[in-house]
A protein has these predicted regions:
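Short glycine-rich, low-complexity segments
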Residues: 1-55, 81-97
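SH3/SH3-like beta-barrel fold
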Residues: 51, 71-75
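Short beta-strand-centered aromatic/proline hotspots
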Residues: 59-65
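Short, conserved beta-turn/loop elements at beta-strand boundaries and strand-helix junctions
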Residues: 66-71, 96-97
C-alpha cells in the first residue's frame, strides 16, 4: 500500500501563506542517533521547521502529517512552498518555531 497522508478540509492540504524566516536558525548541538522520533517532530506540526538532513543542505519545512517512519508537508524552495515528504531516518536534526 502506498504512503498516503490524510488530507485537510475539502481534500487538500493547505500550504503556508507566508514564506519562512530569511535565515536558517543555529544548528542544534545534539543530533539524533538513528532516526528522529515521530513524537518529537509531531510537536512541529503546522509550524515553520528547519530540517538538517543527514546528507545535503538544510531546508525550511512546514509539516502537516507525521507517520511512523516519515513526515510530509511543504518544503520551501526559495520562491514558494512545494508538497514534499522525507523519511525520519534521513533527518539528522530539526528545530521548529
Amino acid at each position: 500500500m502506498a504512503f498516503m497522508p490524510p488530507f485537510g478540509p475539502q481534500g487538500t492540504q493547505q500550504a503556508p501563506t507566508a514564506p519562512p524566516p530569511q535565515s536558517p536558525p543555529p544548528r542544534p548541538l545534539t543530533a539524533s542517533a538513528l532516526a528522529v522520533d515521530p513524537g518529537a517532530i509531531r510537536g512541529c506540526l503546522f509550524r515553520n521547521t528547519y530540517i538538517w538532513p543527514r546528507n545535503g543542505q538544510g531546508f525550511w519545512f512546514y509539516p502537516t502529517f507525521v507517520g511512523r517512519t516519515s513526515v510530509s508537508g511543504f518544503r520551501w524552495n526559495g520562491f514558494f512552498w512545494m508538497y514534499s515528504g522525507i523519511s525520519l531516518d534521513r533527518i539528522e536534526s530539526f528545530t521548529c518555531f
